[in-house]
């Protein structure tokens, strides 16, 4: 028996303020892609790539992440834009890039931003939806979001989700990377990171470069091999020094 969604209080966000006007008339809102506006093959391609940008975020769009069977069904009119969004969120690529590298609380916030176009209202909502993930699984969570009344009222069957009524906020794809700090601390920086690639490249180029005679960098290995003995100060009091014998006498002949 699945647990019902816990109740949570709503907080004030831009999309809930009617005085901000219609999203289409807001100059800060990105172009809205609707299936009703399609009149050519290029238009349907634009809808497909807009959906990829929204679900996968712009910095994650790669050719091997494409879901060609879903694209074909959308082009043939077998599925709606809503089902296309649902399929992208349930794809293996999305699970590998987003789901597997986040805890449930952060995953809720990421999915709300990408599928509903808004942030989580508060921690209570994150907890409520995380329980849905724990009981129904991630696919059940996606179905609950895409089939919700909020999604239907905001986007319907034929509109690609977008960040609703963005005024001064930064775009979600710029403030919500695919994984959080906890995963980065656990996994660390892998050797395939571009920083290691650049470091190895320039190190190899530096080693292959012919240094001129007299260049100090030619003697770095020799300098590193030198192990001088430490000359530490002696712990002697001034009262213990024999000045008569230590200071040479001018009249004394050797």
From Swiss-Prot:
One of its GO terms (cellular component) is plasma membrane-derived thylakoid membrane. It is a peripheral membrane protein. It comes from the Bacteria. GO terms for biological process: photosynthesis. Keywords: Antenna complex, Membrane, Photosynthesis, Phycobilisome, Thylakoid. Residues 11-191 form the PBS-linker domain. It is found in: Cellular thylakoid membrane. Pfam families: PBS_linker_poly (PF00427). Rod-core linker protein required for attachment of phycocyanin to allophycocyanin in cores of phycobilisomes. Linker polypeptides determine the state of aggregation and the location of the disk-shaped phycobiliprotein units within the phycobilisome and modulate their spectroscopic properties in order to mediate a directed and optimal energy transfer. Belongs to the phycobilisome linker protein family. The phycobilisome is a hemidiscoidal structure that is composed of two distinct substructures: a core complex and a number of rods radiating from the core. PANTHER family: PHYCOBILISOME 32.1 KDA LINKER POLYPEPTIDE, PHYCOCYANIN-ASSOCIATED, ROD 2-RELATED (PTHR34011). This is Phycobilisome rod-core linker polypeptide CpcG3. It comes from Mastigocladus laminosus (Fischerella sp.).
